[in-house]
Amino acid sequence: MCIRDRLCITALCGALSACSAPRIDGRAESEHQPSACESAYWAADASTATMNGRHHIIMRYLAAKQAVGQWSEVAATCTQRFAQGTIRSAQAEHMAVTLGTRLGGNDTYRTVSDDSLRQVLGIDLDGATLGAMSLAEDRAGFVMEVLAARDTPGATLSRSDRHKTAGQLLFTASGLSRDPREKVYDIQKILASPTSMTDSTTGLSVPTTALTEIDCAREQLAAMADDGASAKSKHTDKTGNNTNGNGDTDSATDTTDVNATDTNTVGTENDARLRVLSTLISSHITSAFALGYPDMDAFLFS
């Protein structure tokens, strides 16, 4: 081989080594590991599409049943989708109960037990958030008690008691020294319109009992949003990156496997507590549906 040929080969090799490897279409996408939030959202969205699609009623019913829990998972694991997951879960549950009835079933709406609410103790939320939620429960309980005394359809003392008990448990979980619940509230508008009222948010005329439930849910969702999009991670974002609370990735390199395990455990426990709160709020929304509040997006999403 002549010297000139060797020089050409050397130059060619140098040029090739300076080039980056060609990108294979789809490779990066296929190697991407979806986060818990992404997995939950995609599953919930797919089930909802089937639920609302032109499918056999049994397929729609089963999809609705699946979507209930999947949207609750979205609420718990997606830092910016607590309200969406909670409302969608309620809509899916209402659809499941409606379709189940048409199929001759005996489906009922979810409720949250006192023991489940006690598990909220220790959740990574500001005490003021739980305090605001307890206030919403107590107010709804008081209104329901007044309406039950006036024999308003749908208003019962048991419904009132559930709200008040939830309010007490949420206040206990808040750790606040001052109780935000007022116990007695201004109900002049309720007394003037015990059967139906105009919803100030939508302008709809709806049953007063239904409005009481939906207003309770709205107050609680607003409290969660004020907290920072439902416990927006002070420790771990839902994609698995440690954060400092401002969304910046923590560059610390001395975290041990034990600490990582502890963080994952805390995150899992917090997600479980968020599911309880999401289900509680969803139960108020489904109660509103059962009492006559419309379940369309236009009246539920601001």
Feature roles, as predicted:
Residues 1-6:
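Conserved small/polar residues in nucleotide/adenosyl-binding loops
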Residues 20-302:
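All-alpha RGS (Regulator of G-protein Signaling) helical domain and cognate RGS-like helical scaffolds
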Residues 15-18:
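C-terminal motif of bacterial Sec signal peptides marking the signal peptidase cleavage site
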Residues 12:
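Short, positively charged
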